[in-house]
Each structure stands twice: as C-alpha cells, then as structure tokens.
Amino acid sequence: MLTLGVNIDHVATIRQARRTVEPDPVAAAVLAELGGANGITAHLREDRRHMQDRDIRILRETVRTHLNLEMAATEEMVAIALDIKPDYVTLVPEKREEVTTEGGLDIAGSLEKLKNVVDRLQSANIPVSLFIDADEAQIKASAETQAKFIELHTGKYADAPNAEIRQKELESLKLGCEQALSLGLRVNAGHGLTYINVYPVACLPGMEELNIGHTIVSRAVLVGMERAVREMKLAMRGEL
C-alpha cells in the first residue's frame, strides 16, 4: 500500500523567519501522524536554515511512525545520523544558494564516495534512500551502491508547463520505477507534489512512499495539519 511521508521542514521555516520557538515542527509531526501520516520526513541542512539539530533529536524520541532524515552525504551529517539513528536516511544534494533541492544526486559521478556512505549507514542498520532523477544511468549507479531505496525526483513532472510535457515526465518516472524494481531497489518519490498533481504519481506501479511537504504545510496554515494530511491521503487515492 502506498504510504505518505510528511515533510515538516517548512514549519521550521516559518519559525526561523523570526528566530523564535514557534511553530514547533515536533508538534506539527504529532498532528501529522494523527492526521494519518505514515512517516515524518525532516531535512537537516548544513546551513541549518530550517530544521535544527535539537528538532531532529526530539523527533527521534517522539515520532511513532518512522523518521526519514534527509541529509547531504557529508562527514558531519553521517556522524549525526549514526548518533541519532533515524529509521532511514535519504541522501540529497545541497547547494547553499538554492531555495529548495533543485535536482537529484549525481550517483554515477560520486560512486565510490556514496558507496562508502551507504555502507557506513546500512552497517549501522539505517537503510539508505538516494534522491535521484529518473535517469537510467543514475538508477543503475544507485543499485551499485547497495542502497535499499531510491527516491525519484518529481520536480520536472510537477513543474511541467503543459499537459504534454507533464505526461512525458510521468512516463519517465514510470520507466524509472520499472528499472529500479528490476534492479532490486525499492522506490519512493517526491518534490513539488501537490493535491492537484499527486494522483498520477501515486498510481505508478511499485511506488512505496511519497514524501510531500510544502503543499501540506501551506494547506495546514489554512485548515490545520490533521485535515491537511487527511486531504492529501484522499488526493493520493484520487478521492479529493
């Protein structure tokens, strides 16, 4: 059954805009779980622009579903993950000047480094997912790292300027799923998904989890986190 991981980063973004203590992303995670979230996703960036180390430590103690820690493949972040032991880690690219993650990891271009990071984390019983574009070479390289999962970057699909291009990007995601599954990888997806565009991605064969944040937090500002999550679960089933 397809599951929903709710990314709570942008609750912390609102908090950090005023460098205050509210809203609390930990409280948001509790409400997201009450609304039906199957997991909580949080990205601890190197620049700490939203989530803070303390948030991640408290989430590790309070999340009742599973905690997916998004992070760069750096020594600092690997050490934090080995200490906190999230339920799994998603390795993502980072650039300090970006507004949000702009594309997938270049696994093929950093294969030995990423093999080492994946091995260290999975040897500590922390499954690893690699955030990548739906590209044949990147999917093949991901399998070579021995990571358990990939997360397909859905940004090109979500940002498509018209229906024809959107359908082409959806087909690329479908082919990516098929290739990954044939190589023994498990498949998640996320980035830019909304209540309006999520259903076709949710229907892709073999998809396990969608990680969705900004649109849910945006909706939660108006209707509350529990309802926003419930509505996304409906949208994923084509019932909204």
UniProtKB/Swiss-Prot annotation:
Record localization: Cytoplasm
Cellular component terms per the entry's GO annotation: cytosol
Main location class: cytoplasm
UniProt: 3-amino-2-oxopropyl phosphate binding residues: N7, R18, G192, G213, H214
Main EC class the enzyme belongs to: transferase
Residue numbers marked as site, Transition state stabilizer: E151
Keyword set, alphabetical order: Cytoplasm, Pyridoxine biosynthesis, Transferase
Residues in coiled coil: none
InterPro entries to which the protein is assigned, alphabetical: Aldolase_TIM, PyrdxlP_synth_PdxJ, Pyridoxine-5'_phos_synth
Pfam families from the UniProt entry: PdxJ
Single annotated GO MF: pyridoxine 5'-phosphate synthase activity
GO terms under biological process: pyridoxine biosynthetic process
Active-site residues annotated for this sequence: H43 (proton acceptor), E70 (proton acceptor), H191 (proton donor)
Assigned EC number: 2.6.99.2
Pathway: Cofactor biosynthesis; pyridoxine 5'-phosphate biosynthesis; pyridoxine 5'-phosphate from D-erythrose 4-phosphate: step 5/5
UniProt: 1-deoxy-D-xylulose 5-phosphate binding residues: D9, H10, R45, H50, T100
Matches recorded under HAMAP family: PdxJ
Subunit structure: Homooctamer; tetramer of dimers.
Free-text function comment from the UniProt entry: Catalyzes the complicated ring closure reaction between the two acyclic compounds 1-deoxy-D-xylulose-5-phosphate (DXP) and 3-amino-2-oxopropyl phosphate (1-amino-acetone-3-phosphate or AAP) to form pyridoxine 5'-phosphate (PNP) and inorganic phosphate.
Family to which this protein belongs: Belongs to the PNP synthase family.
Stated name of the protein: Pyridoxine 5'-phosphate synthase
Source species: Crocosphaera subtropica (strain ATCC 51142 / BH68)
